[in-house]
Curated annotation (Swiss-Prot):
It comes from Staphylococcus aureus (strain NCTC 8325 / PS 47). Induction: Induced by iron and osmotic shock. Repressed under metal-depleted growth conditions and by manganese-rich growth conditions. Negatively regulated by the ferric uptake regulator (Fur) and PerR. It catalyses: a hydroperoxide + NADH + H(+) = an alcohol + NAD(+) + H2O. One of its GO terms (cellular component) is cytosol. This is Alkyl hydroperoxide reductase C. It is found in: Cytoplasm. Its main location: cytoplasm. Coiled coil: none annotated. Thiol-specific peroxidase that catalyzes the reduction of hydrogen peroxide and organic hydroperoxides to water and alcohols, respectively. Plays a role in cell protection against oxidative stress by detoxifying peroxides. Is important for survival under desiccation conditions. Not required for virulence although is necessary for nasal colonization.
Amino acid sequence: MSLINKEILPFTAQAFDPKKDQFKEVTQEDLKGSWSVVCFYPADFSFVCPTELEDLQNQYEELQKLGVNVFSVSTDTHFVHKAWHDHSDAISKITYTMIGDPSQTITRNFDVLDEATGLAQRGTFIIDPDGVVQASEINADGIGRDASTLAHKIKAAQYVRKNPGEVCPAKWEEGAKTLQPGLDLVGKI
């Protein structure tokens, strides 16, 4: 089921904050008020997951410039996130919040729970300041994501939000021409 244009559901969870090296509570309200990226992954101490999360960290500075808060989520506990951060070269670079979801509440809310394994699927969600999902990507377990595409999607989502009535065509870049859907464009693209 698509979550596009749907408001995120309530949750409360414990998270590891690598910037402060401490645990904290996170709720759906923390994903509101600014743009957010929520990146679900199957498990800590695994294989593809650390490559994805390191890639996301490599894009973190650019995402911060766009006013985006970044969160990762797995069904591991916040304690396991801390241990992984302390022992993995790739994960030790992470500075964004790592949410633990052992109750599977958030994972179910975003419809990325693999019921057979109890683990999260590889899902990425872009959420606007109102807490509404604007974009999503879900991949099979063996297919890692490319975080470099996030900034492009966020810029387009931010532009469309600020410019009602305009849409961004494929491969749109900031400053490029947009489209204004209407009868005058039907059959002319």
